[in-house]
Amino acid sequence: MRGLEKQGSCATAAPCGCVQPALEAGNLLTEPIGYLESCFPAKIGTPRQPSICSHSRACLKIRKNIFNNPEHSLMGLEEFSHVWILFVFHKNGHLNYKAKVQPPRLNGAKTGVFSTRSPHRPNAIGLTLAKLEKVEGGAVYLSGVDMIDGTPVLDIKPYIADYDSPQNLSVHNDHHKLRAEAQVDGTANSCDQLLLSGRGKVQPRQSTKERPKCLEDRTSGENSQKSRDMSEIQHTLPEDRERALDLALEPSRGESMDMPENQLGPPELKSFLEEGTDRPRKVEGALVLPGSSAETQWDASYRARTADRVPYSVVPSWVTEAPVAPLQVRFTPHAEMDLRKLNSGDASQPSFKYFHSAEEAKRAIEAVLSADPRSVYRRKLCEDRLFFFTVDTAHVTCWFGDGFAEVVRIKLASESVQVADPEESLAALGS
């Protein structure tokens, strides 16, 4: 017992010798809150990121052995547009992992595992930002997923732009300080009030293809001019709004301003931002002339106070400018006819389980193939081989050329073509 007490936060040992869960030591036994039902039945063809295919759908049902009333745990979640899904990469095939990996996006180049989203990690845990379609009882319906069917889900968390986005986080942390600094003669500046009134209604700008949508769209043209001006201020992008705040605080700095006129807001804000650089201004109740030592000191003080701002997130160039370029996707006439048959509306014909129409299924297939789902090995050594994957009830056969992918056949998943060689050559189809 004394030995265990001296160990402090070390894991406690059971009589069998196994390590018992201990939160303080970081040892815990996770239990899935549910298992995902996804339109992707296998790893092959599943998007590597949730932003690739917005039409992919899934359903998560909370297990009753987690909560007696699963619907109680989801109360209030329907008010959010997007959610974080924490899950387990349960189809890794092995538990081995390396410090350096070769992500397909780098096309063979190596980088550290913690700088990637590789599933082969010390703890095989994944994170996905998915769109919340609806909450029904104890089930959550999602779209824009990159998880396969049967994925164990560990947790659900709401996406909150003010907390999860570096852009909005900067405005959130500084807004009370900026508001206090913009006060003149004890009264808050009108432009400051107008700008801050829109905080919390703007979703951050995303570098990926898909963006979390604003919960409130722009107001229509039939509203009054004042309402339109207020709406424009509220829906200004975070970085533009932060720039407007900066200009409101130091209007005499001779920096160029490329903000569109329709984003400047009401007349009082426009006139404030359009003040000439040769006009005196008030700083903390005192009149300051341009070029004076007082102005220089105030500018230096302002830059020091705002030096820790992070107006946007930064990613390496291989994320935004990957060596693997997007592919053009095309369908043969026979493949398009097969796709229409899968959703013909005839009771005797099979239909999709997740997609709402054949056109939606086609767009999903295009999104998957445009991102080139092949591994680096297949890209380099199997260029003349067919590629197969399944999405929803459609088993897709395609081949890849120079800068394009062509779908040549689509069959019902239960009737997929069986071939002796899984890497059948293109000549087998007579193409």
Curated annotation (Swiss-Prot):
GO biological process terms held by the UniProt record: tRNA methylation
InterPro entries for this protein: TrmO-like_N, UPF0066_cons_site, YaeB-like, YaeB-like_sf, YaeB_N_sf
Keyword RNA-binding listed: yes
Pfam families: TrmO_N
Domain of life: Eukaryota
CDD domains from the UniProt entry: UPF0066 (cd09281)
UniProt region (Disordered), positions on chain: 196-242
Residue intervals of the TsaA-like domain: 30-168
Positions with biased composition (Basic and acidic residues): 207-242
Ranges that cross the membrane: none
Keywords of this entry: Methyltransferase, RNA-binding, S-adenosyl-L-methionine, Transferase, tRNA processing
Binding site for S-adenosyl-L-methionine: P47, R48, Q49, H90, K91, R117, L127, I148, D149, G150, T151
GO MF terms held by the record: RNA binding; tRNA (L-threonylcarbamoyladenosine(37)-C2) methyltransferase activity
Reaction(s) the record says it catalyses: N(6)-L-threonylcarbamoyladenosine(37) in tRNA + S-adenosyl-L-methionine = N(6)-methyl,N(6)-L-threonylcarbamoyladenosine(37) in tRNA + S-adenosyl-L-homocysteine + H(+)
Enzyme Commission number(s): 2.1.1.-
Classification via PANTHER family: TRNA (ADENINE(37)-N6)-METHYLTRANSFERASE
Family: Belongs to the tRNA methyltransferase O family.
Purpose of the protein: S-adenosyl-L-methionine-dependent methyltransferase responsible for the addition of the methyl group in the formation of N6-methyl-N6-threonylcarbamoyladenosine at position 37 (m(6)t(6)A37) of the tRNA anticodon loop of tRNA(Ser)(GCU). The methyl group of m(6)t(6)A37 may improve the efficiency of the tRNA decoding ability. May bind to tRNA.
Name assigned to this protein: tRNA (adenine(37)-N6)-methyltransferase
Organism, scientific name: Mus musculus (Mouse)
